[in-house]
């Protein structure tokens, strides 16, 4: 677990899983809002990726690449899990820092001879949408197959404020995908 990124390397796979809460505001200028996002390699080929950091393209691309929809994670109502500072004076001194936060918790691993399962939760949507996001990723060690589930857990069963959601898996450029009936 390096800098709150869980890393697991198997015979034919490599997994990076973001299980860290956001940094303090003072040191958050490079934070990308992708709680429970992950990157996955199989047979040394990167398959699933985040969008990267667009700082070599433009300031706008850099900002957009930090939002939740640019990460391989669940996104509710096309919103980002954190709000970013909009004050130009603060941004010119400290970079674009975050002004809201959340916690990642209940990180678990279960590994045996045939599979690896990792899971965690975050409460970034608790105040806005009354729910906690739980992600579980399971890797079959024999063939490298990756399976996962995302759950939204209501904090208060009386209200649930979600209009739409998306779960994005950004494929590495050059990777082709085919939809199956499974």
Specify the residue positions occupied by each region the protein language model found.
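Short, intrinsically disordered, charge-balanced linker/junction segments flanking boundaries
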Residues: 178-182
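Catalytic and substrate-binding regions of extracellular carbohydrate-active enzymes
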Residues: 1-167, 171-175
């Amino acid at each position: 677990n390096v800098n709150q990124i869980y890393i697991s390397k198997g015979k034919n796979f490599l997994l990076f899983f973001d299980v860290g809460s956001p940094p303090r505001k003072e040191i958050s200028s490079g934070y990308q809002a992708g709680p429970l996002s992950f990157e996955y390699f199989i047979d040394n080929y990167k398959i699933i990726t985040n969008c990267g950091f667009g700082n070599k393209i433009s300031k706008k691309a850099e900002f957009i690449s930090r939002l939740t929809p640019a990460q391989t994670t669940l996104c509710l109502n096309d919103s980002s899990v954190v709000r970013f500072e909009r004050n130009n004076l603060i941004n010119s001194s400290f970079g674009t820092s975050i002004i809201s936060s959340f916690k990642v918790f209940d990180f678990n691993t279960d590994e045996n001879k045939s599979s690896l399962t990792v899971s965690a939760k975050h409460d970034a949507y608790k105040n806005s949408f009354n729910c906690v996001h739980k992600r579980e990723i399971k890797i079959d060690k024999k063939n490298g197959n990756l399976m996962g589930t995302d759950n939204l857990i209501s904090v208060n069963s009386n209200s649930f404020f979600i209009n739409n959601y998306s779960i994005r898996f950004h494929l590495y450029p050059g990777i082709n995908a085919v939809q199956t009936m499974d």
